[in-house]
Amino acid sequence: MRPRSNAGSSPPDPEEQEHAQVPSFSSTLEQAIHAALALANARRHELATLEHLLLALIDEPDAARVMKACSVDLEDLKKTLTDFIDDDLSTLVTSVEGSEAVPTAAFQRVIQRAAIHVQSSGRTEVTGANVLVAIFAERESNAAYFLQEQDMTRYDAVNFIAHGVAKDPSYGESRPVQGADEPQETPKAEAGEAKESALSKYCVDLNIKARKGDVDPLIGREAEVERAIQVLCRRRKNNPLLVGDPGVGKTAIAEGLAWKIIKKEVPEVLSGATIFSLDMGALLAGTRYRGDFEERLKAVVKELEDHPDAILFIDEIHTVIGAGATSGGAMDASNLLKPALQGGKLRCMGSTTYKEFRQHFEKDRALSRRFQKIDVNEPSVPDAIKILMGLKPHFEEHHELRYTADAIKSAVELASRYINDRKLPDSAIDVIDEAGAAQHLVSDSKRKKVLGTKEIEAVVAKIARIPPRNVSKDDAETLRDLERTLKRLVFGQDKAIEALSASIKLARAGLREPEKPIGNYLFTGPTGVGKTEVAKQLAATLGVELLRFDMSEYMEKHAVSRLIGAPPGYVGFDQGGMLTDGVDQHPHCVLLLDEIEKAHPDVYNILLQVMDHGKLTDHNGRAVDFRNVILIMTSNVGAADMAKEAIGFGRERRTGEDTAAVERTFTPEFRNRLDAVISFAPLGREIILQVVEKFVLQLEAQLIDRNVHIELTPEAAAWLGEKGYDDKMGARPLGRVIQEHIKKPLAEELLFGKLTKGGLVKVGVKDDAIVLEVQEPQKPRLTGQKPPLLTAE
């Protein structure tokens, strides 16, 4: 084969030649080239051929490693080459004394071809492996023929150099060599050396971790641990699967089981067991080519099967589904594990959440049937307190302080009430850990050595983003003042507020059935009398979330699915239900279903189990707890009948006249589950002045940032009450009167008039009309005293 001619090609750019990096020969390759020339000189050959070069490459480490991986018998090849050089190349012997052997054209082409390939690959060093591959291009040479006789092809060499895939299965662990397309470190281990254990490379020994004290002790969870041990002792399908919400302690059960094993607190059948936690990241890292991942996983499975007391723990086990699969291929980690899991030779423990279990794990029926599902529910508050008391010494040692028993109790109770995006005990552990970490931020002189309830409350307030006073408020004090507080905020509905307060106190006193919500109330009465306002103020007073649903959005039959989620096969199945997700995130809340009579009757049927058993199952089969919910429904049924005047004689408005309308609208089983139907009375004229004052104070609160104060004269208050009073429409007409006669003129003054920099607005009456007297702000006094604060009369 002749070298290609460069005739007709454009000359290379001298600037490119200057910046191009010329590859150098590795020291071992230089020695091999000198050895090839020395072999020719020793035999007084006139030319150094490819056969001389190949014989020298047998002793070059990189080339020798490639040939070994490609099943080449180096001793046999060496003997064949030596015989060929001594017998068939005898014609090259020269009689000229002291002459040096000259490389043949093929010899030079091979070296040049290897250098060009290395340079085009962006590397800087030519190794013996590159030269060995280049020899195969000289197809008519005896050197290439001898390699092919050893059943070695160019593909075998390139496959091992680039991918680390050895043709000889007995050649240790597949590894890349110098000369691959990406720079690699030279492996020090040679073929035949003991391989590192796959378990030690890709798994973590939880028993060793427990002996070192890196695992927290397992407290409680006796039922779950007993069930897991029972499954592990089975003959077949001995694979427990821990399924639960994030933060309930699934991984802690597996680690705690290892801790119990080294403490000899397990049955004799598990006394010698070792739990290995699979490191999926280490298993996948570096597996760039097909076959690498499967080879690693099979090695792990084989070693586990050879270890009769081994238990494999896979955290987040849903990640094995699809791991290592090529595009469109079905061979992933889960399919590699199935045969071992079926026969009982491999004991595997997994953990996952309900969401991933439904979305990934449950869909693979062949895999899920090999596991025995164990539900890990959120522990109760007393159980969570026990868990934290057991973990307390570890956190005290880490943070170098102490927690009081009240602090632990407060952490669990407050985390259960206010931190709703995480579950116990994880949320409570986060609270005490962060409370301890907060002390590291203060100076030594101010650092506290004992943390109590106050520090825990401050941390919960930061995590839950609520005012600290709401956290530290005593429940007993709040309940005692509940009636008085609501009466100050909502006017004219004293009887309704008294009935509501009495029902809530009854539930908080523990005299209510434990599986029911705190209260189920139906507020009835005319529009605009404060039904929705009572629910808002109740949530604010108790310091809980208000979940408000306007039932006019749920008038169609299919709209019910928005509350609990769409069924499988329908759009929105993966989004969840607005009602179930909202209560799941805020278990302690006031649930307000506004204008319930406008909803489809199917909504009433959904609420039956909520009012009776405090549970509602969403579209995924998850039961949502409503036991800490105050359910309030408002309705205007009967308001139209109450607004009608009797023919002939007038009558006095009375509360409770809408009872017949309530009975017509709601079914007996729905009404029978209500704690109370609370009727709101129409607002009287004597109440309207208090409502006027409240609206004006709300307006002043909106203007406080603009430094604008409002002073309302008694005449103006009476005028607003007279114009805004409507016994049929409640307080809403009053809001429109205030907007028309006060807010609109104020907007002009705030934007373009005298109130751009603040000031005082006096609201009076002149010629039976509202008049605004605007005073610009006074200049600051020299004494630095502030002007007295003016409030509405």
Curated annotation (Swiss-Prot):
GO MF assignments = ATP binding; ATP hydrolysis activity
Q: Which GO terms describe its biological process?
A: cellular response to heat; protein unfolding
Note down the stretches annotated as region Disordered: 1-24, 169-194
The segment(s) forming the Clp R domain are 22-168
- Alphabetic keyword roster: ATP-binding, Chaperone, Nucleotide-binding, Repeat
**Which residue ranges are recorded for the region named Repeat 2?**
103-168
> What protein family does this chain belong to?
Belongs to the ClpA/ClpB family.
* Family annotation (PANTHER family): ATP-DEPENDENT CLP PROTEASE, ATP-DEPENDENT CLP PROTEASE ATP-BINDING SUBUNIT CLPA
User: What is the name listed in the Swiss-Prot or TrEMBL entry for this protein?
Assistant: ClpA homolog protein
Which organism encodes this protein? Answer: Fuscovulum blasticum (Rhodobacter blasticus)
